[in-house]
């Protein structure tokens, strides 16, 4: 129906006849000549409807309004002197219309398509209108390129694309499952997969050797800016591999994805042990676009005559005292800002925020009186302090201190404008603990219980490490993976350490244990969150900007009004009766 997309046209097409299709983005009547900005998925081009060129087209144009669907035929000409629009990629040209057709009309839209001030709820209610915005379209054009690049890259490395089931069995993977009642087997439920984890391991047991899938996953969890109840991941598994092999494959397809999106990245990515990431940055996904690395000063504080700090410093296993040096911070931060910093860390469990300022005549601040001159000199040397600097200290329980100082590090970086929004800093975080302790004292798998432990015979669960790895970009976890357990006895031992008894093992994971008993190969893999990846590539503020029809933070679709009540007939067929007064 059309001869070109708008964006395909430029000054080299002057004199050509074209046929264009799209929507009225804006409409202006200038003394009898009507100008229409015609929008298609690629962008905007200006139509000129002059009665001297075509009375019929001019008359039809006079009836057009915003969001009407038009088909326009005409000739490309250059814009007049001083009329070039540098904001448009087609700003050097316009189309003199000889024939115009209104294919469909539109009622008055609830908002202007390009209006960025419209609240998100209204945009999501009318998502089909919101998606007409060329800026959003560009997000999905990049997403499409990324998916094609991932498929091509993995296929070139010998991976086979295989689809795994959506209706499956509930397995504990860290979040709540979405359950689907069975009509045929009343009282029983399918679960929507949180990941294809077990199925891809079974494919390795089947001898498929190299698998991938761009997979839909579902998790019933509380939502944040970077979470959705349904999301997409680039899922990869391979046999007869070590950690370095999986990392090499992941770096290869990530490099190809970024190249397809117009960005060059350098490989290999740097690597950092989990322990070092936590101790130096207070996060297992540190943002390395800026420094502000922690400095360990617990040994110096152990010599202070402040009872609180001295007691904290006695137990170096359970407690931490960390410093963050801000060069020239004393010349930058006002007294009010220093108060704001303390208010910030208190929100995350800090008792306060101690600091020392570096003046021309030495170190100053309430802390200084608790240290000898020798200890202050050692502190100054350890922190590499210079005149004008300020150094902040966090002290207390290990988990609390690392958490709030990690958050404070990012807060400071934003305050100081240290983050380059165009930088791409990749990092592998490796050697994660196998288990983590919950608030109730019990233990759970830090990644998942199918991860291969390094030292399974260690008596202290907190000392058992795993062959697990996460890939981080600019402080955001893009994805993670591990070498898997491929031996039945090791898998059963991990289950027992997690207090999953033999009966539960058979009920929940019997099929996996069976598969591991029939000569399962060594295998491992990784999953990359596609939505997060595209969010970072496009610079979108929210993951909802890169998902065509996203849910709200209350897991609702405002457009379709899902979820919604089921009919009484459907409930009867499923054998389900709801309790009254459900809230």
UniProtKB/Swiss-Prot annotation:
Task: Say yes or no: keyword Zinc present.
Answer: no
What reactions does this protein catalyze? tRNA(Asx) + L-aspartate + ATP = L-aspartyl-tRNA(Asx) + AMP + diphosphate
This protein's GO CC annotations: cytoplasm
Positions bound to L-aspartate = 173, 219, 447, 484
Q: What class of enzyme is it?
A: ligase
Q: Which Gene3D superfamilies match?
A: Bira Bifunctional Protein, Domain 2 (3.30.930.10), GAD-like domain (3.30.1360.30), Nucleic acid-binding proteins (2.40.50.140)
* Stretches the record annotates as Aspartate: 197-200
Question: Keywords for this entry?
Answer: Aminoacyl-tRNA synthetase, ATP-binding, Cytoplasm, Ligase, Nucleotide-binding, Protein biosynthesis
Q: Which domain of life is it from?
A: Bacteria
**Could you provide one GO biological process annotation from this protein's UniProt record?**
aspartyl-tRNA aminoacylation
Pfam families attached here?
GAD, tRNA-synt_2, tRNA_anti-codon
What Enzyme Commission number does this protein have? 6.1.1.23
Q: Which CDD domains match?
A: AspRS_core, EcAspRS_like_N
Q: What's a single GO MF annotation on this record?
A: aspartate-tRNA ligase activity
Primary role: Aspartyl-tRNA synthetase with relaxed tRNA specificity since it is able to aspartylate not only its cognate tRNA(Asp) but also tRNA(Asn). Reaction proceeds in two steps: L-aspartate is first activated by ATP to form Asp-AMP and then transferred to the acceptor end of tRNA(Asp/Asn).
Q: Can you state the subunit structure given in the record?
A: Homodimer.
What is the protein name for this chain? Answer: Aspartate--tRNA(Asp/Asn) ligase
Species in which this protein is naturally found: Campylobacter jejuni subsp. doylei (strain ATCC BAA-1458 / RM4099 / 269.97)
